[in-house]
Amino acid sequence: EMQRSLVGSEMCIRDSRMAFLFLQYIITILLLVLSLYFGKQLNFLLSTPPGYRTEGILRAELFHENNNHLVREEEADRNKRAARYSYIKQQLNECPYIEMWMNSHPSILRGSSFCTLLNDKDTRQNMLTLFPSPNFFHLYDLKVLEGEIPQKFESWSDYKIILNKAAMKAMGYARMEDAFVRSESPLWITFRNGEMEEGGTKLMPVVAVIDDYYPAHLTQGVKPMAFVVGKEDVSGDFIIATKPGKEKEVMELLRKIEKEVYNTEEFNHSWLTDEVSDLYSEDRETAHIYSVFALIAIAISCLGLFGLSLFDIRQRYREIAIRKVNGAGMKDLYLLLFRKYIKVIGGAFIVAVPLSYYLIHIYTRTFIMKAPVGIGIYFIALLVILLISLGTLIWQIHKAANIDPAKIIKSE
């Protein structure tokens, strides 16, 4: 009776350990799949072209003065300020390492706002709106689908409207010639003869249509965008497109200019490649966190598997000895000892697959652009778990399969 109680107790301990190992495998496979997916998602985000030029684009604050013509100042001070600005422009124009440059308040990722525009049927659409100069489209290599980017403007109050493809679709236009839009509120305000004039509230023809690009994080997708294009800014940041491989030389020139004009080599600047990279800093952190936890889970599972298998296989030495006496080969013994763990891994995999798919779906449900889950990450996760488990078990199974039956039976 006592022997039966001991056997039952051992079986209970073994079953509880197997259940714990089963749970460990579910967590490990789950974390491994999530780690693989978020790594895939990060690679997808970084490798998908944003729709505009990113290489060699520098945003720099070179002019450290108030360029507002409404601010009162002495004529001598105004002339000195204008001379400094002209000198900076001259140096940039003469630099052989610069393809082109412009002054601009908005950049490809900054300076946008939301405005409500209406078409000729008064259909409203809240869309991202920028106020760039004509050079904006050329500098960022934005593709023009219809029309032309305007170059001539009669005055500072002369603005033209350009839409992207998504905005044309949102407004219900198939052709540029049919497209007319106006703003619900003034887009610009000018003063003429002492009176204030509000602009942009009357229907204006769309003069060009550009291809869509991603104005923010890729997962937000493309957005309807309007570009209110006017004369080139004489204020704002300097946006500089360098020739390939000449970024270092351009930076040296800019430091030299700042030293000559303001007696300092320090100025705020950022490369567009870095700005785009910063958009995905949280995605990098997420992928890194899941990778770390997946490695920890794998290590814990290996320890759990090692401890359980050490206990379990030693309990089966007598069974192994009898099977060897009855003619069981090494292959049969390997299958016998590994079969139980294969079932545990298989069961855990069956549970972890739908659970991981559901978690990925919940996390990415608001993403417009995302990497497909794909069967590949599940295959890789299963393969990794099998190889690691086999590596953990192989030494003990090999040792058990090579025992001397006579010694085991004699000890029994």
Question: Where does each model-flagged region fall?
Answer:
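Membrane-proximal extracellular/periplasmic loop immediately following the first transmembrane helix
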Residues: G39, N43-N119, T123-R124, T129
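Intracellular coupling helices
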Residues: G8-E10, L303-K343, N402-S411
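Conserved transmembrane alpha-helices of multi-pass membrane proteins
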Residues: R14-A19, L23, S291, I368-W395, ...
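Hydrophobic secondary-structure segments that place a key small or acidic residue at a functional site
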Residues: Q125-V222
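"Rare, low-scoring activations can occur
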Residues: A83-R84, I88-P96, K165-A166, W188-A287, ...
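Transmembrane alpha-helical interface segments in multi-pass membrane proteins
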Residues: A297, R318-T364, F379-I380, V384
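Single conserved hydrophobic/aromatic residue that forms the stacking wall/gate
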Residues: E1-G8, C12-I13
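Hydrophobic alpha-helical transmembrane segments of multi-pass inner-membrane transport and secretion
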Residues: R17-Q41, R284-R318, G346-G347, V351, ...
